[in-house]
């Protein structure tokens, strides 16, 4: 199982095998192993990775203690990854984008763009009302339920509300190219989230 933490840089296109391939560029790593979790002590096997160095003044004293115990520099992002054998890793070990190869299949988890409180037409692609003269509703929701029976709105009814900022995983994305010197990874297709947003990269589970 390969994994790393990254940030979305943006999209571009590459020329490969006489075809234009749309790719998303990710700045992946370098990450540092901050902590190891074991079945005996914590009930499960996992390692905790740190990403992006940060000034000590921006962290609380308990968080600083975690990094001082591991003897590593303070990190902005901490994420846990389940592993079968924690003995393969050591605290302070650096994990870079070089662990991946061109053609690898990976799963990418990100958070979609937050669009705030949105109406039913934008959030659920509702048709809306008539646009002609005389109509008193154009972008409204419409009927949401009956009056006398059942005299309530059913759970799950699609209505206006907060739209976006949801955790989404893209399965089986293909690694197109790697720039290990600059910690860059180019994957085929799109990746959820805005430019600069955080993404989690793992080896594909369903291949």
From Swiss-Prot:
Q: One MF term in GO for this entry? A: structural constituent of ribosome
One GO location term (cellular component): cytosolic large ribosomal subunit
Which Gene Ontology terms describe the biological processes this protein takes part in? translation
- What keywords appear on the UniProt entry? Ribonucleoprotein, Ribosomal protein, RNA-binding, rRNA-binding
Q: Entry's Pfam families?
A: Ribosomal_L3
InterPro entries (UniProt xref): Ribosomal_uL3, Ribosomal_uL3_bac/org-type, Ribosomal_uL3_CS, Transl_B-barrel_sf
- Supply the HAMAP family for this chain: Ribosomal_uL3_B
Cited function: One of the primary rRNA binding proteins, it binds directly near the 3'-end of the 23S rRNA, where it nucleates assembly of the 50S subunit.
Summarize the subunit comment: Part of the 50S ribosomal subunit. Forms a cluster with proteins L14 and L19.
Provide the family line: Belongs to the universal ribosomal protein uL3 family.
Indicate what this protein is called per its UniProt record: Large ribosomal subunit protein uL3
Gene behind the chain: rplC
């Amino acid at each position: 199982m390969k994994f790393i933490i990254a940030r979305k840089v943006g999209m571009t296109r590459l020329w490969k095998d006489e075809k234009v391939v749309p790719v998303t560029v990710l700045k992946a790593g370098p990450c540092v192993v901050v902590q190891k979790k074991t079945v005996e002590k914590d009930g499960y096997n996992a390692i905790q990775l740190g990403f992006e160095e940060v000034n000590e003044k921006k962290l609380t004293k308990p968080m600083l203690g975690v990094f001082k115990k591991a003897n590593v520099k303070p990190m902005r992002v901490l994420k846990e990854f389940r592993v079968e054998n924690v003995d393969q890793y050591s605290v302070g070990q650096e994990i870079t984008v070089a662990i991946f190869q061109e053609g690898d299949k990976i799963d990418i988890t990100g958070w979609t763009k937050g669009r705030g409180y949105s109406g039913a037409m934008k959030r659920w692609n509702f048709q809306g009302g008539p646009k002609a003269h005389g109509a008193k509703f154009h972008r409204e929701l419409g009927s949401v339920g009956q009056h006398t029976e059942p005299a309530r709105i059913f759970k799950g009814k699609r209505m206006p509300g907060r739209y976006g900022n949801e955790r989404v995983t893209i399965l089986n994305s293909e690694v197109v190219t790697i720039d290990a010197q600059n910690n860059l990874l180019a994957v085929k297709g799109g990746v959820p989230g805005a430019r600069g947003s955080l993404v989690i990269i793992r080896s594909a589970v369903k291949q």
